[in-house]
Amino acid sequence: MRSPVLIINCKNYEEAAGGRIRGLADAAAGAAARYGVRIAIAPPQHLLGIIAGRDLGVLAQHVDDKGTGSTTGYVVPELLKQSGVSGAIINHSEHRVPADQVAGLVPRLRGLGMVSVVCVRDPAEAADLSRYCPDYIAIEPPELIGSGRSVSTERPQVIQEAAEAIRGAGGVKLLCGAGITSGADVRRALELGSEGILVASGVVKSADPAGAIGELARAMS
């Protein structure tokens, strides 16, 4: 995915359930075309097939370092690829995995031509996990996730320190998330060194999700 990028994590919010995910995906695709910004959406896992294959990045919210075959219940990269999914979020604060799984998953996704977005809690973890050279490192201080208090205003130094921490990591790009709700939050994050945004409740639980997507995308254009 080219920069800048906006990733919308729908988590397991009821606002993204059933057919409502199509409305979010349509709004995201429209904003991407209007503002020339790359947008990806991570729907609830069981809804991946509904929007996969659209002219829109589609990410799994989690992926397992397991193989195809007799691996009941696991989310397998190769089957995601065959279903039109373009990449995966790894190590989200709500679904943490050991570093050795990150080490296995990042090259596996790369080998399939898929995007890896590795979430970290702080600059130290950014430095540690960037050695596996994912496409993106997403810095999200857990205390700000879903708070409505933006990392770019509450903890701006975290973005700057994370950008510095991954500087020598072979083209890894920095995203930031946690509390992003407005175009002003986005602009500030980009000024601080982020190359994109990972957002969840600020869009999905908004009274006007399409309007929220448009505001964030416009700030990145």
From Swiss-Prot:
InterPro entries: Aldolase_TIM, TIM_sf, Triosephosphate_isomerase, Triosephosphate_isomerase_arc. PROSITE patterns: TIM_2. Its EC number is 5.3.1.1. It is an enzyme of class 5 (isomerase). Pathway: Carbohydrate biosynthesis; gluconeogenesis; Carbohydrate degradation; glycolysis; D-glyceraldehyde 3-phosphate from glycerone phosphate: step 1/1. GO terms for biological process: gluconeogenesis; glycolytic process. Its main location: cytoplasm. Involved in the gluconeogenesis. Catalyzes stereospecifically the conversion of dihydroxyacetone phosphate (DHAP) to D-glyceraldehyde-3-phosphate (G3P). This is Triosephosphate isomerase. It comes from Cenarchaeum symbiosum. The gene is tpiA.
